[in-house]
From Swiss-Prot:
Organism listed in the record: Saccharum hybrid (Sugarcane)
Reactions that this protein is recorded to catalyse: ATP + H2O + 4 H(+)(in) = ADP + phosphate + 5 H(+)(out)
Record-given protein name: ATP synthase subunit alpha, chloroplastic
Binding residues annotated for ATP, in chain numbering: 169-176
Annotated site residue numbers, Required for activity: 362
Keywords, in A-Z order: ATP synthesis, ATP-binding, CF(1), Chloroplast, Hydrogen ion transport, Ion transport, Membrane, Nucleotide-binding, Plastid, Thylakoid, Translocase, Transport
Top EC group: translocase
């Protein structure tokens, strides 16, 4: 009979116990009771936070939005077709966040910061919360640096500064996206990082914008965040916050950023869809009660930092679509009240061939001339006044049969100034050329020309000025002031061009 050796057994047991390294972890698990229309209801998950990420057994992720006494309402970040009733759901213990890095420049990504341009994965070592608090009052400073859009009508009369939030509002097909994309094109060489967020748009429209950026060399400093019309409502709702998180990454590194939200009407509609499916009580136009907070917490993240924080900035240009020019609808009034001004695009002006179709009368920038260089202030004041007088006189002229000579001259000048504001798409002008163009119009040099000749004359003048008087651009760009020397050079160029132009017309 074999004898039991107690010390040997003891040694084996000790070795086995020492080798045992199984970790015990606590996981917050729930079970699906209902799923459909991008919403899942879960029982369990007692310790879940509002906005926490959850993971379903088949891999889909979701965000906990409704925390009710009996169940949790989850919005799905995917189609959720494989999720089954009774399957397990695990809380991750994390709020939604995305990776961030310089490697995102030049890429097209979705709301989860995953690349969708077929150019491989993006390597990032850092991450940021999709929703982070806006900078406080103490960390900000007032807007004082101009952000040039390259559009004469905006830079002269509705100036935008770095750190400002300026709404672009108008009916569909009035050129809202064109104004935003031209602004991005004009940032070339300005050391501004641009983020273009496309929400609920057709894939063909987004592809067209990306192609334009590639052709004009703007993709080098631009990130495109795109969620198309066929994307789940949750991802359309998240896309602007993803864009803001990427822009913030650069802003906190003392860089200047520009972010376009195209457009926030579709984000509000996606949020309304989610809220109604979660059975939240509807309010005005069936939007939930917190739809104002949806946009205010997004747009308040745009800021101009003070010198202690490195003077970085994030300029936001949200776009909102109106129905038949109705700016008193719920979403337009909300966003107008949050932003620092609005650029109103009119369908009537667009159809009349005035493009960009900016209605200068009801557009406003609440930052004003603080966001203009001195040279622009010197020439733009007269332009605003003359266009306002022209609009008033034009309305009166419709009913008056005979007008005196002064009024006729004023109307003729106004028509030429309106012609001067027209610009073709993807053709932004540097501020030096804008100053020259406005000066030519407001000083009456265009009065002798036919309206049809104005565009051709100005194009040739800008080229002539660039070729023969390069000192003009140097003076404006270095001193930011319209000096006497600059004015003399410009007058000479205008006179030379008028003579050349009259000879051309005669031949």
């Amino acid at each position: 009979m074999a004898t039991l050796r107690v010390d040997e057994i003891n040694k084996i047991l000790r070795e086995r116990i020492e080798q045992y390294n199984r970790k015990v972890g606590i996981e917050n698990i729930g079970r699906v009771v209902q799923v459909g229309d991008g919403i899942a209801r879960i029982i369990g998950l007692g310790e879940i936070m509002s906005g926490e990420l959850v993971e379903f057994a088949e891999g889909t992720r979701g965000i906990a939005l409704n925390l009710e006494s009996k169940n949790v309402g989850i919005v799905l970040m995917g189609d959720g077709l494989m999720i089954q009733e009774g399957s397990f759901v695990k809380a991750t213990g994390r709020i939604a966040q995305i990776p961030v890095s310089e490697a995102y420049l030049g890429r097209v990504i979705n709301a989860l910061a995953k690349p969708i341009d077929g150019r491989g994965e993006i390597v990032a070592s850092e991450s940021r919360l999709i929703e982070s608090p806006a900078p406080g009052i103490i960390s900000r400073r007032s807007v004082y640096e101009p952000l040039q859009t390259g559009l004469i009508a905006i830079d002269s009369m509705i100036p935008i500064g770095r750190g400002q939030r300026e709404l672009i509002i108008g009916d569909r097909q009035t050129g809202k996206t064109a104004v935003a994309t031209d602004t991005i094109l004009n940032q070339k060489g300005q050391d501004v990082i641009c983020v273009y967020v496309a929400i609920g748009q057709r894939a063909s429209s987004v592809a067209q914008v990306v192609t334009t950026f590639h052709e004009e060399g703007a993709m080098e400093y631009t990130i495109v965040v795109a969620e198309m019309a066929d994307s789940p409502a949750t991802l359309q709702y998240l896309a602007p916050y993803t864009g803001a998180a990427l822009a913030e990454y650069f802003m906190y590194r003392e860089r200047h950023t520009l972010i376009i939200y195209d457009d926030l009407s579709k984000q509000a509609q996606a949020y309304r869809q989610m809220s109604l499916l979660l059975r939240r009580p509807p309010g005005r136009e069936a939007y939930p009660g917190d739809v104002f907070y949806l946009h205010s917490r997004l747009l308040e993240r745009a800021a101009k930092f003070n010198s202690l924080l490195g003077e970085g900035s994030m300029t936001a240009l949200p776009i909102v679509e109106t129905q038949s020019g109705d700016v008193s609808a719920y979403i337009p009034t909300n966003v107008i009240s949050i932003t620092d001004g609005q650029i109103f695009l009119s369908a009537d002006l667009f159809n009349a061939g005035i493009r960009p179709a900016i209605n200068v009368g009801i557009s406003v920038s609440r930052v004003g001339s603080a966001a203009q260089i001195k040279a622009m202030k010197q020439v733009a004041g007269k332009l605003k006044l003359e266009l306002a007088q022209f609009a008033e006189l034009q309305a009166f002229a419709q009913f008056a049969s005979a007008l005196d000579k002064t009024s006729q001259n004023q109307l003729a000048r106004g028509r030429r100034l309106r012609e001067l504001l027209k610009q073709s798409q993807s053709n932004p002008l540097p501020v030096e050329e804008q100053v020259a163009t406005i000066y030519t119009g407001t000083r009456g040099y265009l009065d002798s020309l036919e309206i049809e000749q104005v565009k051709k004359f100005l194009d040739e003048l800008r080229k002539h000025l660039k070729d023969t008087k390069p000192q003009f651009q140097e003076i404006i760009s270095s001193s930011k002031t319209f000096t006497e020397q600059a004015e003399t050079l410009l007058k000479e160029a205008i006179q030379e061009q008028l003579e050349r132009f009259s000879l051309q017309e005669q031949t």
